[in-house]
Structures are given as C-alpha cells and as structure tokens.
From Swiss-Prot:
Entries under InterPro entries matching the protein: ADP_ATP_car_bac_type
UniProt entry tagged with the keyword Aminoacyl-tRNA synthetase: no
Record-given protein name: ADP,ATP carrier protein 2
GO MF terms held by the record: ATP binding; ATP:ADP antiporter activity
Location within or outside the cell: Cell membrane
One of the record's GO cellular component terms: plasma membrane
C-alpha cells in the first residue's frame, strides 16, 4: 500500500501517473483503446477509398451517405444494442456486436466485393438518373453501389458503437472517478498513436501487400484483403483484452483490490441519471440558458464547418487519384499526420496554452486555425479556377496538387485541434454550472447538437448540389456559409469567455467563503478542545 500513497516524481507524474498496482487494469485498457483505434483508422481510409474513387459522383456522395445511410444505420444498431443490453450480459453484448462488425468486414472482402458488379442496382440507377436533377447523382451512386455504401455505413458505426459506446462503456465501468483523471489522458494518447500506427501500416500494405491472395480480382482487392486480415486480427486482440477486463469488472475482484468503496465512473453516471427523469425537458433547459445556448452554437459550428471543408477537400483529392490504391495511400498518410499532430499538440501545447492565457484563448484556437488554414485552401482553389499558376509554379507542382495538399493540411489541423483544444475547452465550459445545467445541458449538447451539426452540413450540401449540380460550382455559396459559421463561432466564444470568467470567479468566491467558514469552525473547535483539556487549579 505504500506505493499507493507515494507521490510520483515530476516527470512520471506528467507523463505516466499510474501506480504499479493499477497496471493489471490500465495496460489491457490502454491496448484495448489502441486496437479499437487502429481498426477505426484503417476503416476510415478504406471506406473513403472504396466509395469515393471510381464513381461519377466522387465526394458528392458523402452528404447523402451521412443523412440517408449513417443516421438510419445508427438508429437501427442502437436499437439492437438496447434490445441486447436488456436481455444479455455485458460481455455477451460486447462480443456479439464486435464479432458482428468483424464478420461483416470479412464477408465483404471475401464474398461481396468480388461479385459486386452482379449485386449493384445498375438499372434502378439509370431510372433514378433520368428522374433526379444532375445534383442528385450522389444519391444515385449511393443506391447503385449499395454494397459499398453499406461498408461505408458500417465503418462509420464502428466509431459510434464500438469506440464511443462499447469501449468507453467498459472504461467507465471499470475505472473509478479518482483513476479516470489519470487514465483517460493516456488512453487518448493511445488513440492518437493508433492513428499513426494504422496510417503507416495501411500505407505500407498499399505499396507492398504482405499476402498475395489468389482470389483477388484486382490490385485494390488484394490491398483490401490484407487490410481486412489486419482488422480481423486486431479484432481478435480486442476480444481477448475484453475478456481480461471482464474478469476485473467482477464485483468480488474489485472488493479484493480495495475498490468497492469507491464509486466508478459508470456508477457516478447512474447516480446522476436517477434524477434525470425529474427534468421535464433537456431542451427547455437549453433554451432557458444563454450560456448553454452559447456552448451549443460552438459545438454546432465545429461539426458544420469540418464537414463543409472536408467534402471540398475530398472532391479535390478524387480528381488527382483515379486508383483506389493511390487514394488509400494518400489518406493513410493524412491519418498518420493527424495522429502525430494530435499527440504533440495534446502533450506540449493545449494544456499549457489554456493554463497560461485562459479559457477564451484556448477556445479561439480551433476557429482561428480553421479560418487561417481554410483561407489558404480556398484561396488556392480560387487561384486554380482563375488559371493562376503563381504558387504552383514556384513550388514546382500543379495547382490541383497544391489545393489537395493545402486541404490535407487543413484537415490534419482541424482534426488535431478537435481532439485537444476543442474537446478540452468544451468540457471546461460546463464546470462552473449548477449540477442540473451541467448534466442535462451536456446530455443535450453531446447527444443531439453534435449530430445536428454533422447532419446539417450534409443537408446544406444536398441543397447546394441540387441547385448548382456540383461541389465545384457550389464553392461561392459554401464559402459564404463557412464565413458565417466561423464568424458566429468566434463571436460566441468571445461572449462565452466573459461569462465563463464571471462564473468561475463567482464559484471561486463561494468556495473561498465556505473554506473561511470551515476554517473558523475548526479554530473554534480547537479552542474548545484546548480549554476542555486544561486542568482546574485548586488552592489549599
């Protein structure tokens, strides 16, 4: 037990604040996060390569998939998860869902992709194309290549179901509140490192497939089979690590380790949810609080802006890479860079910036970064549209390659600041609120507003595509929407910063007053104890 009370050295306390007795819990949890993140990153690059390259719609299919594919898919899988959770044990639910995902990816690579031409709805697509306007070709491609669309949806659901729901459900259940403050920062670092690992492995497999599969129908199929084999192997490790953690989640083992008296993160959430039914409406509370509305605007703005930028960037990349193998290699390198920048920013910049210059400066980093990198990206696109060869000629590359490269830089930094500055300042913004506002407001914002932002961006694109027929033709309208969203984001953060400062100062004054009262009570109690210990003086 001495190790538990012994303080860490300054170096270890900063980089690895884990006690030796916690290794049996932390190490499998860390590697579980790592391998779940590896599969997430591999699937992210693979789904884009499969769906975007080779079709006549390119990146225009993304907005339609987000609304008509991912949203219904998320609802269906969430219903399945809820149904299973009510009838089966936690372990059965985890293994069944993860096994279901792995089984689908293996089935797709070995059976569905090779016979895809026979499965695709070419006649229906031709009929839809004759009915819909030119801007609806993204919807037509989504329906025509339904098997690719299904792979895209399942890959996206790995993030929301396996990573967000299953993994963090395990982490919250097994981790105490005291441990979470030390565990979760390192786990997030593990997720960033998994992006680096997955990006480099995917890049290498694209250039040098490890196994030459005789059943491969084309070069991309061979790469897909190798990546799928890695996904299945990582899935096997995930299931093995979960079984180790499942034994630790048993209440008797937690008692033996002295953790029974301490509330876990999952138990804490359960305690908070007991009062949740008393709230008439999450959104009524949200609408009554200008402060919570400000946080909602910030979350909505980020999800809207990142989606608008991403579709334009991927549209540029699709024009350069006609091969799925080449496109996958490019996206793999972007994944690697995102992981590196996220890890370095999280370790060396985000926390120090907020501690030194305050919440407002930290919260302004995401919109300003996206504004600056986005201006460079869109400026290059407008230069290409105007046949300007200035920067491309100086750098010795074509203007189209330059725009794609700048779009990649914009995406890397946008994703990196999301995992560091944005998430941290968003969570900090809830701290000075009352418990009801904090719990109910956070549930509404994280559970609904973030999804509204993503779907809202897709709906904006669908409307623009119907009107202007293509992403390139919609660029002026997209620029206006982006400027309005970024301007609103920055304005709201400036206002929120003043409110946050006022609320935290008021909270600090309350805490100081309470501490003063407690100190006075302790001093009075000490004085009474001292007087009671004095022996009476008697005289003869």
């Amino acid at each position: 037990m001495s190790s538990e009370v012994k303080s860490f050295s300054k170096f270890r306390g900063y980089f690895f604040p884990i006690y030796r007795s916690e290794f049996s819990k932390f190490i499998p949890l860390f590697f579980l996060a790592f391998f779940v993140g590896v599969n997430y990153a591999l699937l992210k690059t693979t789904k884009d390569s499969l769906v975007l390259v080779g079709s006549r719609a390119g990146a225009e299919v993304i907005p339609f998939l987000k609304v008509w594919g991912i949203v219904p898919g998320a609802v269906i899988v969430t219903m399945i998860y809820g149904w299973m959770s009510r009838r089966y044990s936690r372990g059965t639910v985890f293994i069944s869902l993860v096994g279901g995902f792995l089984g689908f990816f293996a089935l797709f690579a070995t059976v569905i992709y090779p016979i895809g031409d026979a499965l695709h709805l070419n006649k229906l697509a031709a009929k839809l194309q004759s009915i819909l306007p030119p801007g609806g070709r993204g919807f037509v491609v989504m329906v025509q290549y339904w098997s690719y669309s299904l792979y895209y949806v399942m890959s996206e659901l790995w993030s929301s179901i396996v990573l967000s729901t299953l993994f963090w459900g395990v982490a919250n259940h097994i981790t105490s509140v005291r441990e979470a403050g030390r565990f979760y920062a390192l786990i997030n670092t593990g997720l960033n490192l998994s992006s680096v690992f997955a990006g480099e492995v995917s890049l290498w497999l694209g250039r040098n497939p490890v196994i030459a599969f005789p059943m491969a129908v084309d070069p991309w199929h061979e790469v897909l089979l190798n990546i799928t084999l890695l996904i299945v192997l990582a899935g096997g490790v995930i299931l093995y690590l979960y079984q180790k953690l499942d034994r630790l989640m048993d209440e008797t083992s937690m008692l033996k380790e002295g953790l029974a008296a301490e509330m876990s993160v999952a138990q804490l959430k359960k305690e908070k949810k007991r009062s949740k039914a008393k709230a008439k409406s999450l959104f009524a509370l949200l609408l009554r609080s200008r402060y919570l509305l400000g946080i909602a605007v910030v979350v909505l703005s980020y999800n809207l802006v990142i989606h608008l930028f991403e579709v334009v960037w991927k549209d540029q990349v699709c024009r350069i890479y006609a091969s799925r193998v080449e496109f996958n290699s490019y996206m793999s390198r972007i994944t690697t860079l995102t992981g590196i920048v996220s890890a370095l920013t999280g370790i060396f910049a985000a926390g120090q910036t907020i501690r030194r210059w305050g919440w407002t400066i930290g919260a302004l980093v995401p919109p300003l970064t996206m504004l600056i990198t986005g201006a460079l990206f869109f400026g290059a696109i407008y230069a290409v549209k105007g046949d300007a060869m200035i920067f491309g000629g100086i750098l010795g590359i074509s203007p189209l390659v330059l725009t794609a490269w700048l779009g990649g830089v914009q995406n890397v930094f946008s994703r990196a600041i999301k995992f560091t500055y944005f998430d941290q300042t968003k969570e900090m913004a809830f701290i000075p609120l009352e418990d009801d506002e904090k719990n109910y407001g956070k549930a509404a914002i994280d559970g609904v507003i973030s999804r509204v932002g993503k779907s809202g961006g897709s709906l904006v694109y669908q409307g623009l595509l119907i009107i202007f027929s293509s992403v390139a033709a919609s660029l002026n309208a997209i620029t206006i929407v982006l400027l309005l969203a970024l301007g609103s984001w920055i304005f709201v953060i400036a206002w929120l910063g003043r409110e946050y400062t006022a609320k935290t100062e008021a909270l600090f004054r309350v805490n100081v007053s309470e501490e003063d009262v407690l100190q006075e009570e302790r001093e009075a109690s000490s004085l009474v104890d001292a007087e009671s210990r004095e022996e009476p003086v008697t005289t003869l």
